[in-house]
Protein backbone atom coordinates (compact mmCIF):
# COMPACT_ATOMS: atom_id res chain seq x y z
CA UNK A 1 0.00 0.00 0.00
CA UNK A 2 1.31 3.45 -0.97
CA UNK A 3 1.43 5.85 1.95
CA UNK A 4 -0.39 9.16 1.60
CA UNK A 5 2.06 12.06 1.36
CA UNK A 6 2.33 14.35 4.33
CA UNK A 7 0.19 17.48 4.30
CA UNK A 8 2.45 20.55 4.23
CA UNK A 9 1.09 23.35 6.40
CA UNK A 10 2.31 26.93 6.64
CA UNK A 11 0.91 28.07 9.99
CA UNK A 12 0.83 31.87 10.46
CA UNK A 13 -0.04 34.05 13.45
CA UNK A 14 0.76 37.60 14.52
CA UNK A 15 -0.91 37.45 17.92
CA UNK A 16 -0.57 39.18 21.25
CA UNK A 17 1.78 38.13 24.02
CA UNK A 18 -1.09 36.32 25.78
CA UNK A 19 -4.58 35.22 24.80
CA UNK A 20 -6.80 32.23 24.24
CA UNK A 21 -6.26 32.09 20.48
CA UNK A 22 -2.51 32.48 20.90
CA UNK A 23 -2.40 29.70 23.48
CA UNK A 24 -4.36 27.37 21.24
CA UNK A 25 -2.15 28.23 18.25
CA UNK A 26 0.85 27.13 20.30
CA UNK A 27 -0.83 23.88 21.32
CA UNK A 28 -2.03 23.05 17.83
CA UNK A 29 1.32 23.88 16.22
CA UNK A 30 3.10 21.56 18.65
CA UNK A 31 0.49 18.86 18.00
CA UNK A 32 0.94 19.20 14.23
CA UNK A 33 4.69 18.83 14.76
CA UNK A 34 4.16 15.54 16.60
CA UNK A 35 1.81 14.21 13.92
CA UNK A 36 3.57 11.94 11.42
CA UNK A 37 1.02 12.86 8.75
CA UNK A 38 1.88 16.56 8.76
CA UNK A 39 4.91 18.63 7.77
CA UNK A 40 4.84 22.17 9.13
CA UNK A 41 6.53 25.54 9.04
CA UNK A 42 5.31 28.38 11.25
CA UNK A 43 5.53 32.16 10.89
CA UNK A 44 5.12 34.19 14.07
CA UNK A 45 5.58 37.75 15.20
CA UNK A 46 8.93 38.00 16.98
CA UNK A 47 8.00 37.11 20.55
CA UNK A 48 10.57 35.82 23.02
CA UNK A 49 8.16 33.75 25.12
CA UNK A 50 6.49 32.11 22.11
CA UNK A 51 9.84 31.37 20.49
CA UNK A 52 11.07 29.82 23.74
CA UNK A 53 8.07 27.45 23.83
CA UNK A 54 8.82 26.30 20.31
CA UNK A 55 12.60 26.02 20.55
CA UNK A 56 12.63 22.27 21.27
CA UNK A 57 9.29 21.37 19.69
CA UNK A 58 9.22 22.92 16.21
CA UNK A 59 11.99 22.70 13.63
CA UNK A 60 11.00 25.34 11.10
CA UNK A 61 10.18 28.80 12.46
CA UNK A 62 10.22 32.15 10.70
CA UNK A 63 9.82 35.44 12.57
CA UNK A 64 8.56 38.83 11.46
CA UNK A 65 8.99 41.92 13.65
CA UNK A 66 6.29 44.21 12.22
CA UNK A 67 3.29 42.07 11.27
CA UNK A 68 1.11 44.47 9.27
CA UNK A 69 -0.41 44.74 5.80
CA UNK A 70 1.23 48.17 5.44
CA UNK A 71 4.66 46.61 5.89
CA UNK A 72 5.82 45.57 2.39
CA UNK A 73 8.63 43.46 3.87
CA UNK A 74 6.07 41.37 5.75
CA UNK A 75 4.11 40.46 2.62
CA UNK A 76 7.30 39.95 0.62
CA UNK A 77 8.72 37.56 3.22
CA UNK A 78 5.52 35.51 3.38
CA UNK A 79 5.41 35.28 -0.43
CA UNK A 80 9.05 34.15 -0.49
CA UNK A 81 8.40 31.47 2.13
CA UNK A 82 5.36 30.17 0.22
CA UNK A 83 7.36 30.02 -3.00
CA UNK A 84 10.18 28.05 -1.36
CA UNK A 85 8.18 25.87 1.05
CA UNK A 86 5.29 25.05 -1.32
CA UNK A 87 2.61 24.33 1.33
CA UNK A 88 -0.64 22.52 0.60
CA UNK A 89 -2.39 24.54 3.31
CA UNK A 90 -1.76 28.10 4.42
CA UNK A 91 -3.44 28.43 7.84
CA UNK A 92 -3.81 32.07 8.93
CA UNK A 93 -4.94 32.98 12.44
CA UNK A 94 -7.20 35.93 13.21
CA UNK A 95 -7.37 39.30 11.48
CA UNK A 96 -3.79 40.41 11.12
CA UNK A 97 -2.28 37.24 9.67
CA UNK A 98 -5.26 36.78 7.35
CA UNK A 99 -4.92 40.33 6.04
CA UNK A 100 -1.20 40.07 5.15
CA UNK A 101 -1.30 36.84 3.13
CA UNK A 102 -0.73 37.25 -0.63
CA UNK A 103 -3.52 38.39 -2.94
CA UNK A 104 -2.67 35.73 -5.51
CA UNK A 105 -1.89 32.03 -5.39
CA UNK A 106 1.82 31.28 -5.59
CA UNK A 107 1.91 27.46 -5.55
CA UNK A 108 -1.79 26.58 -5.64
CA UNK A 109 -1.83 26.62 -1.84
CA UNK A 110 -5.25 26.50 -0.17
CA UNK A 111 -5.72 29.38 2.24
CA UNK A 112 -7.68 28.68 5.42
CA UNK A 113 -8.50 31.45 7.88
CA UNK A 114 -9.04 30.48 11.50
CA UNK A 115 -11.46 32.58 13.58
CA UNK A 116 -11.89 32.49 17.35
CA UNK A 117 -14.19 35.50 17.63
CA UNK A 118 -16.73 37.66 15.84
CA UNK A 119 -14.12 39.37 13.69
CA UNK A 120 -14.66 41.60 10.68
CA UNK A 121 -15.12 39.27 7.74
CA UNK A 122 -13.46 41.73 5.35
CA UNK A 123 -10.11 40.55 6.76
CA UNK A 124 -10.71 37.07 5.31
CA UNK A 125 -11.41 37.89 1.67
CA UNK A 126 -8.15 36.20 0.62
CA UNK A 127 -9.15 32.91 2.28
CA UNK A 128 -10.62 29.95 0.41
CA UNK A 129 -12.03 28.33 3.56
CA UNK A 130 -12.64 29.31 7.16
CA UNK A 131 -12.44 27.39 10.43
CA UNK A 132 -14.43 28.56 13.46
CA UNK A 133 -14.08 27.20 16.97
CA UNK A 134 -17.80 27.37 17.82
CA UNK A 135 -20.98 26.48 15.94
CA UNK A 136 -22.35 29.98 16.66
CA UNK A 137 -19.32 31.53 14.97
CA UNK A 138 -19.93 29.33 11.95
CA UNK A 139 -23.51 30.64 11.76
CA UNK A 140 -22.19 34.20 12.06
CA UNK A 141 -19.73 33.70 9.18
CA UNK A 142 -22.41 32.14 6.97
CA UNK A 143 -24.77 35.03 7.78
CA UNK A 144 -22.12 37.35 6.33
CA UNK A 145 -22.33 35.60 2.97
CA UNK A 146 -19.90 32.69 3.21
CA UNK A 147 -20.78 29.39 1.55
CA UNK A 148 -21.74 26.87 4.24
CA UNK A 149 -19.58 24.24 2.49
CA UNK A 150 -16.51 26.43 2.95
CA UNK A 151 -16.85 26.97 6.70
CA UNK A 152 -15.80 24.25 9.14
CA UNK A 153 -16.49 24.16 12.86
CA UNK A 154 -13.59 22.62 14.81
CA UNK A 155 -13.47 23.30 18.56
CA UNK A 156 -10.32 23.78 20.60
CA UNK A 157 -8.70 21.03 22.61
CA UNK A 158 -6.78 21.08 25.86
CA UNK A 159 -3.79 18.86 26.53
CA UNK A 160 -3.57 16.48 29.43
CA UNK A 161 0.20 16.28 29.54
CA UNK A 162 0.50 18.89 32.28
CA UNK A 163 -2.42 17.71 34.39
CA UNK A 164 -1.27 16.50 37.78
CA UNK A 165 -3.72 13.93 39.07
CA UNK A 166 -2.68 14.52 42.68
CA UNK A 167 -4.70 17.41 44.05
CA UNK A 168 -3.20 19.76 46.61
CA UNK A 169 -4.52 19.65 50.16
CA UNK A 170 -5.32 23.31 49.69
CA UNK A 171 -8.46 22.10 47.86
CA UNK A 172 -10.15 21.89 51.24
CA UNK A 173 -9.82 25.65 51.63
CA UNK A 174 -12.64 26.29 49.12
CA UNK A 175 -10.71 28.21 46.53
CA UNK A 176 -12.53 29.77 43.58
CA UNK A 177 -10.38 30.26 40.50
CA UNK A 178 -10.85 32.75 37.66
CA UNK A 179 -8.36 32.97 34.78
CA UNK A 180 -8.23 35.31 31.78
CA UNK A 181 -7.42 38.74 30.43
CA UNK A 182 -8.30 41.68 32.66
CA UNK A 183 -10.81 43.10 30.18
CA UNK A 184 -14.44 44.29 30.58
CA UNK A 185 -15.67 41.30 28.54
CA UNK A 186 -14.34 38.90 31.18
CA UNK A 187 -16.56 40.42 33.94
CA UNK A 188 -14.11 39.59 36.70
CA UNK A 189 -15.53 42.58 38.58
CA UNK A 190 -18.79 40.62 39.02
CA UNK A 191 -16.93 37.80 40.74
CA UNK A 192 -15.05 40.17 43.04
CA UNK A 193 -18.36 41.83 44.01
CA UNK A 194 -19.74 38.38 44.84
CA UNK A 195 -16.97 37.60 47.33
CA UNK A 196 -18.39 39.58 50.32
CA UNK A 197 -21.36 37.17 50.16
CA UNK A 198 -19.09 34.11 50.04
CA UNK A 199 -17.17 34.50 53.33
CA UNK A 200 -16.02 30.87 53.44
CA UNK A 201 -14.27 31.09 50.07
CA UNK A 202 -10.99 32.47 48.79
CA UNK A 203 -10.56 33.75 45.22
CA UNK A 204 -7.50 33.40 43.01
CA UNK A 205 -7.52 35.66 39.92
CA UNK A 206 -4.88 34.79 37.33
CA UNK A 207 -4.17 37.01 34.34
CA UNK A 208 -2.96 40.34 33.02
CA UNK A 209 -4.53 43.42 31.51
CA UNK A 210 -5.71 46.99 31.69
CA UNK A 211 -8.20 46.52 34.53
CA UNK A 212 -5.84 45.20 37.19
CA UNK A 213 -5.78 48.48 39.13
CA UNK A 214 -9.58 48.64 39.10
CA UNK A 215 -9.78 45.11 40.48
CA UNK A 216 -7.35 46.07 43.24
CA UNK A 217 -9.55 49.05 44.12
CA UNK A 218 -12.61 46.78 44.36
CA UNK A 219 -10.73 44.31 46.53
CA UNK A 220 -9.78 47.08 48.97
CA UNK A 221 -13.25 48.63 48.85
CA UNK A 222 -14.85 45.38 50.02
CA UNK A 223 -12.01 44.60 52.45
CA UNK A 224 -11.13 41.37 50.64
CA UNK A 225 -7.33 41.63 50.75
CA UNK A 226 -6.97 38.50 52.89
CA UNK A 227 -9.22 36.35 50.69
CA UNK A 228 -8.72 37.59 47.13
CA UNK A 229 -5.32 37.32 45.46
CA UNK A 230 -4.23 38.41 41.97
CA UNK A 231 -1.51 36.40 40.22
CA UNK A 232 0.33 37.12 36.99
CA UNK A 233 -0.54 34.91 34.05
CA UNK A 234 1.23 31.56 34.02
CA UNK A 235 1.53 29.13 31.13
CA UNK A 236 1.36 26.33 33.69
CA UNK A 237 -2.33 26.76 34.42
CA UNK A 238 -2.47 23.28 35.95
CA UNK A 239 -0.61 24.72 38.93
CA UNK A 240 -3.69 26.83 39.73
CA UNK A 241 -6.39 24.44 38.56
CA UNK A 242 -5.07 21.73 40.86
CA UNK A 243 -5.44 24.06 43.85
CA UNK A 244 -9.03 25.17 43.28
CA UNK A 245 -12.36 23.64 44.20
CA UNK A 246 -14.51 25.64 41.75
CA UNK A 247 -13.64 27.35 38.45
CA UNK A 248 -15.71 30.40 37.50
CA UNK A 249 -16.00 31.95 34.02
CA UNK A 250 -18.18 35.06 34.57
CA UNK A 251 -17.75 36.56 31.07
CA UNK A 252 -20.09 39.08 29.48
CA UNK A 253 -18.78 38.02 26.08
CA UNK A 254 -16.83 34.82 25.38
CA UNK A 255 -16.74 33.21 21.91
CA UNK A 256 -15.41 29.86 23.13
CA UNK A 257 -13.90 29.77 26.61
CA UNK A 258 -10.83 27.50 26.59
CA UNK A 259 -10.66 27.66 30.35
CA UNK A 260 -13.97 25.78 30.67
CA UNK A 261 -12.49 22.79 28.83
CA UNK A 262 -9.38 23.09 31.00
CA UNK A 263 -11.60 22.80 34.07
CA UNK A 264 -13.33 19.72 32.66
CA UNK A 265 -9.99 18.07 31.88
CA UNK A 266 -8.72 18.80 35.39
CA UNK A 267 -11.94 17.43 36.93
CA UNK A 268 -12.91 20.79 38.44
CA UNK A 269 -16.61 21.81 38.55
CA UNK A 270 -17.21 24.95 36.48
CA UNK A 271 -19.65 27.83 36.94
CA UNK A 272 -20.20 29.95 33.82
CA UNK A 273 -22.34 32.86 32.68
CA UNK A 274 -25.17 31.97 30.32
CA UNK A 275 -23.63 33.63 27.25
CA UNK A 276 -21.41 32.76 24.28
CA UNK A 277 -19.31 29.63 24.08
CA UNK A 278 -19.45 28.65 27.77
CA UNK A 279 -23.21 29.19 27.87
CA UNK A 280 -23.58 26.94 24.84
CA UNK A 281 -21.22 24.08 25.67
CA UNK A 282 -22.11 23.77 29.37
CA UNK A 283 -25.30 21.85 30.16
CA UNK A 284 -26.75 23.20 33.39
CA UNK A 285 -26.41 20.76 36.30
CA UNK A 286 -24.95 18.16 33.93
CA UNK A 287 -21.51 19.42 32.88
CA UNK A 288 -21.46 22.64 34.88
CA UNK A 289 -23.56 25.36 36.46
CA UNK A 290 -24.88 28.41 34.61
CA UNK A 291 -25.78 31.77 36.13
CA UNK A 292 -27.38 34.86 34.63
CA UNK A 293 -24.83 37.20 33.05
CA UNK A 294 -23.92 40.22 35.21
CA UNK A 295 -26.11 38.97 38.07
CA UNK A 296 -23.90 38.93 41.15
CA UNK A 297 -26.55 37.47 43.43
CA UNK A 298 -27.39 34.64 41.04
CA UNK A 299 -23.67 33.85 40.87
CA UNK A 300 -23.45 33.78 44.69
CA UNK A 301 -26.47 31.49 44.92
CA UNK A 302 -25.15 29.07 42.29
CA UNK A 303 -21.71 28.82 43.93
CA UNK A 304 -23.24 28.15 47.36
CA UNK A 305 -25.63 25.53 46.01
CA UNK A 306 -22.89 23.74 44.10
CA UNK A 307 -20.55 23.71 47.07
CA UNK A 308 -23.21 22.28 49.40
CA UNK A 309 -24.38 19.55 47.00
CA UNK A 310 -21.55 17.00 46.92
CA UNK A 311 -23.58 14.56 44.81
CA UNK A 312 -24.23 17.20 42.14
CA UNK A 313 -20.59 18.23 42.17
CA UNK A 314 -19.41 14.63 41.58
CA UNK A 315 -21.97 14.16 38.80
CA UNK A 316 -20.84 17.34 37.03
CA UNK A 317 -17.15 16.44 37.27
CA UNK A 318 -17.68 12.93 35.86
CA UNK A 319 -19.97 14.05 33.02
CA UNK A 320 -17.75 16.98 32.05
CA UNK A 321 -14.61 14.85 31.98
CA UNK A 322 -16.33 12.33 29.72
CA UNK A 323 -17.38 15.11 27.32
CA UNK A 324 -13.81 16.40 27.31
CA UNK A 325 -12.43 12.97 26.40
CA UNK A 326 -15.02 12.42 23.69
CA UNK A 327 -15.06 15.84 22.03
CA UNK A 328 -12.19 18.08 23.17
CA UNK A 329 -9.11 15.89 23.51
CA UNK A 330 -5.99 16.55 21.44
CA UNK A 331 -6.33 13.32 19.47
CA UNK A 332 -9.95 14.02 18.47
CA UNK A 333 -9.37 17.62 17.37
CA UNK A 334 -6.13 17.04 15.45
CA UNK A 335 -7.85 14.19 13.63
CA UNK A 336 -10.66 16.60 12.68
CA UNK A 337 -8.15 19.12 11.29
CA UNK A 338 -6.47 16.37 9.27
CA UNK A 339 -9.70 15.07 7.77
CA UNK A 340 -10.80 18.61 6.90
CA UNK A 341 -7.48 19.41 5.20
CA UNK A 342 -7.58 16.16 3.23
CA UNK A 343 -11.13 16.85 2.12
CA UNK A 344 -10.44 20.35 0.82
CA UNK A 345 -7.19 19.28 -0.87
CA UNK A 346 -9.12 16.56 -2.69
CA UNK A 347 -11.95 18.96 -3.55
CA UNK A 348 -9.59 21.58 -4.98
CA UNK A 349 -7.76 18.95 -7.05
CA UNK A 350 -10.93 17.76 -8.80
Question: What residues fall within each predicted segment?
Answer:
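A conserved mid-protein helix/loop that constitutes part of the nucleotide-sugar donor-binding site
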Residues: 19-30, 174, 178-197, 210-216, ...
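Short hydrophobic beta-strand element within catalytic cores of glycosyltransferases
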Residues: 269-272, 282
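Carbohydrate-associated surface elements
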Residues: 136, 157
